[in-house]
Amino acid sequence: MPKHGKKYVEAAKKVDSNKLYSVEDAIKLVKETSYANFDASVEVSYNLSVDPKQADQQIRGSIVLPNGTGKSVKVIVFAEGPQAEAAKAAGADEVGADDLVEKVQNGYLDFDVVIATPMMMAKVGRLGRVLGPKGLMPNPKTGTVTMDTAKAVQNVKAGQVEYRVDRQASIHTAIGKVSFTEEQLTENFRALQNAILRAKPASAKGQYIKSCAVAATFGPGIKLDPIALMA
């Protein structure tokens, strides 16, 4: 086990590791236990009763958080014609087709989200070795493969986050910054929570949400009551 520093130890003293907190109490505690010398992210971790090896239990999607993420996001769009113009008008940081594919192949990686029209995916697919390991490959399930490039760009800029179950049947995503109000963080959490519940596979067995915790970056985890989350 890694040895934690003094600040972490002091923060952890405020958390009862045997208690399952309500959403409101957990959010309040996250703000109180953040000790980073920057505006830390507030992160949520779920462990679900799903089998990621089963195709119908590979949960993945996106949600626009009502209060945004607190982060400035750079978006590039692979599109041509009207879809390219719409993406530019919506505020995309870079829009292109073959020229943008070549630019990325040559090492350009100064972006956080990639959007593409369906027609461009054959060309974007050539970037799989670059985009895939970074989780940047566009996907219809997350709204990043679409003809409505303007809406996709607007959603990302407004605070869209992706959620995806990993091999351990866990989901990790950020819901904002410590500087957000408790109400803003709670609203964002509820939006993510509702999306996770809606994504429950029909074939999932047992208690869907096995555990859930929130934490500030570097801060101690605060466990929530999974039964209450499913009520």
UniProtKB/Swiss-Prot annotation:
Sections of the chain in a coiled coil:
none
One Pfam family it belongs to: Ribosomal_L1
Q: Which GO terms describe its molecular function?
A: rRNA binding; structural constituent of ribosome; tRNA binding
Record PROSITE patterns: RIBOSOMAL_L1 (PS01199)
Keywords in alphabetical order, please. Repressor, Ribonucleoprotein, Ribosomal protein, RNA-binding, rRNA-binding, Translation regulation, tRNA-binding
Report the InterPro entries cross-referenced here.
Answer: Ribosom_uL1_bac-type, Ribosomal_uL1, Ribosomal_uL1-like, Ribosomal_uL1/biogenesis, Ribosomal_uL1_3-a/b-sand, Ribosomal_uL1_CS
Q: Which GO terms describe its cellular component?
A: large ribosomal subunit
Sorted alphabetically, the Gene Ontology BP terms of this entry are: regulation of translation; translation
Which PANTHER family does this entry report, sorted A to Z? 54S RIBOSOMAL PROTEIN L1, MITOCHONDRIAL, LARGE RIBOSOMAL SUBUNIT PROTEIN UL1M
What this chain does, per the entry, is described as: Binds directly to 23S rRNA. The L1 stalk is quite mobile in the ribosome, and is involved in E site tRNA release. Protein L1 is also a translational repressor protein, it controls the translation of the L11 operon by binding to its mRNA.
Q: Tell me which family the UniProt entry assigns to this protein.
A: Belongs to the universal ribosomal protein uL1 family.
Subunit composition and interactions = Part of the 50S ribosomal subunit.
Provide the protein name. Answer: Large ribosomal subunit protein uL1
| Source organism (scientific name) | Lactobacillus delbrueckii subsp. bulgaricus (strain ATCC 11842 / DSM 20081 / BCRC 10696 / JCM 1002 / NBRC 13953 / NCIMB 11778 / NCTC 12712 / WDCM 00102 / Lb 14)
